[in-house]
Amino acid sequence: MKIGILAVQGDVEEHEYAVKKAMDELGISGDVARVKRIDDLRGLSGIIIPGGESTSIWRLTSKSNLMNALRDEVSNGLPAMGTCAGAIFMAREVKDRIMGETGQGVLGIMNISVVRNFYGRQRESFETTLNIEGIGTVRAVFIRAPAIVKYWGSAKPLVAYGDNYPVVIENNMLALTFHPELTTILVHEWFISNLVKK
C-alpha cells in the first residue's frame, strides 16, 4: 500500500505522521509518498489533499498540470481524502462567505457545495467534538474552515454540525472541513480501511 499526500503546501508532515501511525495500528505495511509532480501519482493506493491556502496551492500546481492529472486519477477510482482546503478542491461548487463567486480553480469531482471561510477568519477558528458515523467521536479543529452546505447525488454526510456537514463521503472520496491530522488517527484509519483497501 502506498498513500500519497499532495505536498505543495499545508499540513503535509502531520498527515504523514497520521497515515504511518494508522497503518501501524491497522497492522498494514505501506509507504507514504509526497506528491509534487505528475509522476508522483504513479502506483498510489490513495491520496490525501491536505489543508492549506487553497488559492496558493492551486496557483503552485496549475502550471505543471498536476491538478488535472489528479482529477483524472480520482475520477478513475483513486481513493481520495480532502481536508479543509482539500474539501474545497474536491467540490463541484465553491463560493466565499464574503466575496461570493471567486473563480477559484477546483477539481470539481464531488457533489458538494462549499463556502470558503464559512466561520470567519483566523480568530474565529475553533474546536468541537463530532460523532462521525462509522468513525467515532473525534476532536475536530476548524481553522479558517470552509463548510459543506449542500450535497446531492451519491454524496452522503457522515455528520451534521448546525446547518452544514463537516464530513461527506461519495464513492471513493472523503471530504472533511476540519483538520483530523491534528488530533486523531481515527479518520486516517477509516480512510485506509474503508476506501483504500476496498
UniProtKB/Swiss-Prot annotation:
Subunit note = In the presence of PdxS, forms a dodecamer of heterodimers. Only shows activity in the heterodimer.
Report the record's Gene Ontology biological process terms: glutamine catabolic process; pyridoxal phosphate biosynthetic process; pyridoxine metabolic process
What SUPFAM superfamilies would the database entry show?
Class I glutamine amidotransferase-like
Its pathway is: Cofactor biosynthesis; pyridoxal 5'-phosphate biosynthesis
NCBIfam families per the record?
A: PLP_synth_Pdx2
Instruction: Describe the family membership recorded for this protein in Swiss-Prot or TrEMBL.
Output: Belongs to the glutaminase PdxT/SNO family.
Binding locations of L-glutamine? G52, E53, S54, R116, I143, R144
UniProt organism field: Caldivirga maquilingensis (strain ATCC 700844 / DSM 13496 / JCM 10307 / IC-167)
Q: Name the active site residues.
A: C84 (nucleophile), H179 (charge relay system), E181 (charge relay system)
Q: Name one GO molecular function term.
A: pyridoxal 5'-phosphate synthase (glutamine hydrolysing) activity
**Does Chloroplast appear among the keywords?**
no
Keyword field contains Ligase:
no
Query: What is the protein name given in its UniProt record?
Result: Pyridoxal 5'-phosphate synthase subunit PdxT
Annotated GO CC locations = cytosol; glutaminase complex
Kindly state which keywords UniProt assigns to this record, in alphabetical order. Answer: Glutamine amidotransferase, Hydrolase, Lyase, Pyridoxal phosphate
Its gene name is: pdxT
What does the record give as the reaction this protein catalyses? aldehydo-D-ribose 5-phosphate + D-glyceraldehyde 3-phosphate + L-glutamine = pyridoxal 5'-phosphate + L-glutamate + phosphate + 3 H2O + H(+); L-glutamine + H2O = L-glutamate + NH4(+)
Task: Provide the function of this protein.
Answer: Catalyzes the hydrolysis of glutamine to glutamate and ammonia as part of the biosynthesis of pyridoxal 5'-phosphate. The resulting ammonia molecule is channeled to the active site of PdxS.
Its Enzyme Commission number(s) read 4.3.3.6, 3.5.1.2
